[in-house]
A protein has these predicted regions:
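Compact, Lys/Arg-rich rRNA/RNP-binding cores from ribosome-related proteins
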Residues: 2-92
Length: 92
């Protein structure tokens, strides 16, 4: 793997749009927002974004009805088996 195949950044993901959903779906939708935001900014498909459990725990920390308004994640993009993959973990 060459250095051009690896990229790591700390990204702030806005989750305010999750409040447009019904209260029973907000945390679920917030996880989808994180996955979509990282896929867009790292130029990969949403299926190629792997979220660490720490991201899930941070979204669900206040319960299903009240996800945080924004979330900072440390994301790394690299090539695995010829396909670009993004792995993300919660950045405190």
């Amino acid at each position: 793997m060459s250095t051009s195949d690896f990229e790591e950044r700390v990204v702030t993901v806005p989750l305010r749009d999750a409040n447009d959903k019904p209260v029973q779906q907000r945390a679920d939708y917030a996880v989808k927002i994180v996955r979509g935001h990282l896929a867009k900014h790292f130029s990969v498909d949403e299926e190629d974004v792997v979220l660490d459990t720490s991201v899930n725990e941070a979204v669900w920390a206040n319960g299903r009805q009240n996800p945080p308004s924004k979330l900072r994640v440390r994301a790394a993009r690299f090539v695995e088996d010829g396909d670009p993959v993004v792995e993300a973990e919660y950045a405190e």
